Amino acid sequence: MQSIYGASREHYTILRKMPYALSFLHRQLFVKLPMPTKSFQGKTVIVTGSNVGLGLEASRWIVRLGASRLILACRNVQKGRAAAKDIQTSTGCSPETLDVWELDMASYKSVQAFASRVHTDLPRLDVFIANAGINSHQFQTFEKDEAMITVNVVSLFLLGLLLYPKLRETAAKYKLQTNLTITSSDLHEIAKFEEREAPDGQIFCALNDQSKFSGIDRYATSKLMEILLVKEIAAMAPLESRNVIINCVSPGLVPPSSR
């Protein structure tokens, strides 16, 4: 039986007894994840942040597993096309399998335009992998909020909620389960999230206080917020009635990649 960390039941028992840092190292050094084998035959998949790193490698595996159509959602279309060519070369897939669509998670207008295109141009949507995110040690704002909160939290869930009806429609039409999966991080464990103590309705104002900004804590906080929001949405949209699986995954420690 696989645990949420990809480990056996015995490994999971060991992990539960360890402090966070030790359990993290244990997973990194001793837990070997199985290669994916689930077929994506006939499925349409969207992966955001798919021109590099985790998004690129996830996209490559999805194509290897037989996806009929994969949308590479990228801020930079030119880099997205280079990624598509790389995937074609390594997998031998048909060029018609891959599409590159522009998506800038720092812009609500771009997020809304992307979602509108999905509803207009895609007959179905089986899997949405929300992988795009940023990690910065410098304070900056997008859409009047701190950048990591805008990109990693608000835009992510705006897009997820806009695409949810398409996932639900596909599940009902084809009598299967669809997926909304968010790339989170083990770093949520170390989030201080002191802004949660702000008065009602003032959390975002507190997060915009540059004098109290810490890059590493803000990134960890954004990942904690992802997990908390996924739990809330999953509770409001039970799998039994809608057949849309909503979850988070943690990739562990991976090498950084430039965007």
Residue ranges and their predicted role:
Residues 20, 25-258:
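Rossmann-fold NAD(P)H-dependent dehydrogenase/reductase core
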Residues 1-19:
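Cytosolic, low-complexity regulatory segments enriched in Ser/Pro/Gly with interspersed Lys/Arg
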